Regions:
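Enzymes that bind and transform nitrogen-containing heteroaromatic metabolites
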Residues: 1-195
Length: 195
């Protein structure tokens, strides 16, 4: 990755018990999250050029659009604008969807195309399944973690890979504008394979 290229990030808010969405991708629990400082959401949104989402989450967001509040109905509460890739095995079904590019490809191709578009800005993954696929190929450069003070008990797990490999992370920064949300930035500890 060149010095003038953006990063591939996986950013999320999760419940204390490790869910990033409730049953049926419900996001109403996000109201329990501590609000971030003024300008924090806009700052984070400005760093992102391309969002990569999965089909299940995209469909749920569309179906729940009238039920979701401003914060959860659009990426970054509506503060973000850019390109959204939706990875799906049925891209033709989203041919008329506004503001999205539906793609039927593997994660390496999707991230490569996203990085080309992003330039110096970041590519943000907002799907647990897509992030899992990216981690399998060591494609995530940064993990952005926020925690909401709520137990969900059920829903979409943050990371659920029975038999999967261990991935170690190192803390590289804290989000000073979100101390009550436990905002933390990590990068993967990658082992060198050279001699």
């Amino acid at each position: 990755m060149g010095a003038d290229m953006g990063k591939v990030t996986w950013g999320f808010t999760c419940s204390i018990d490790g869910f990033i969405a409730g049953p049926g991708h419900d996001m109403s629990w996000m109201s329990a999250a501590e609000p971030l400082a003024d300008g924090a959401i806009e700052r984070m949104a400005g760093e992102v050029a391309v969002i990569i989402s999965g089909r299940d989450g995209y469909d749920a967001a569309q179906a729940q659009r009238g039920e979701r509040d401003e914060l959860t109905s659009e990426a970054y509460g509506g503060a973000w604008s850019g390109t959204e890739f939706v990875l799906t095995h049925r891209p033709e079904e989203l041919a008329d969807a506004p503001n999205v590019t539906a793609m039927n490809c593997d994660i390496t191709e999707a991230i490569g195309r996203a990085l080309d578009i992003a330039g110096e800005r970041n590519v943000q993954i907002i799907s647990a399944d897509i992030a899992r696929q990216a981690l399998e190929h060591d494609l995530i450069d940064e993990l952005q973690v926020f925690v909401a003070p709520v137990f969900l008990g059920d829903g979409v797990r943050l990371f659920d890979v029975p038999g999967g490999r261990r991935v170690d992370w190192e803390l590289v920064d804290t989000c000073d504008d979100s101390p009550r949300s436990f905002g933390r930035i990590y990068r993967p500890k990658r082992t060198s394979t050279g001699a």
